Amino acid sequence: APQPADEGYRAAYSVDADGNDIFDSSMNDEQKYDAALKAAVTFFEKAGYTFDADGKVASAPAGAPESYEILIPGQGKQDHPTYGIATAASKALETIGIKLSVNDVGTSVWNNALEGNTAQMWVAAWQSTADPDMYQVYHSSNAHGKGTNSNHYQVDDPALDALIIDGRTSADTEYRKSVYKQAMEIIMDWGVELPVYQRKDCTVASTIRVDCDTLPKDMTPYWGWKAEIETLAVK
């Protein structure tokens, strides 16, 4: 995945519909929230929505729903790290006349909607393999109930498909990185995924029982303490 030090790196959805930067370094959190809402209006306008003098939706494009729903598998207890984000977004969108219902449901309800491709919007967390292959989640062969039905975004884009196949057939890390960056840009243009956080693993060991100098150096989610267990020393 692209890193902050890479040339051209920027945060996801940090420009408006015209490509202008939404945020600057002088903004506090409240100013950023306000700027993000104004930028959201530019995207709605590009999609065909019109707004009245009070800044609320006056009309929607043909075929657009009057309200939206996001499913969160919080078991009805708000037990999910993105619940607060979704409810804050709902309140913000309400101020411009867009209704976003946050539906906190059980895992089975959420899973049935996801597998049946009936969920309008949803939140989830997953982990990729050590080989960051994008085929399963984003290739059109797994969309619309086909293949593994694991492309829940239903994205069907020949250009994206070609990049995914190109990237997975090369063992050159730098080349794959450049190809996948292009693929990620297409995915962002589709607007089907909003990255929220990346979970980090933590390894805790007792220095009384373990010689910590024998733990693997620079551990990652894919190369943990078990990866070099044959050299691990205990006291």
Regions from the PLM with identified roles:
Residues 4-6, 19, 23-37, 47-128:
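Ligand/substrate-recognition segments at binding pockets and active sites
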Residues 41-50, 91-98, 115-119, 127, ...:
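Sec-exported extracytoplasmic/periplasmic mature domains
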Residues 2-38, 53-66, 113-117, 137-169, ...:
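Short, solvent-exposed loop/beta-turn-alpha elements that line the ligand-binding surface or hinge
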Residues 36-37, 41, 87-91, 100, ...:
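Generic hydrophobic/packing signal
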Residues 47-75, 124-125, 170-207:
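Bilobed periplasmic-binding protein-like "clamshell/Venus-flytrap" ligand-binding domains
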Residues 132-135:
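Short beta-strand-centered segments that line the small-molecule binding cleft or hinge
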Residues 35, 84, 107, 146, ...:
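Residue-level detector of functional hotspots within protein domains
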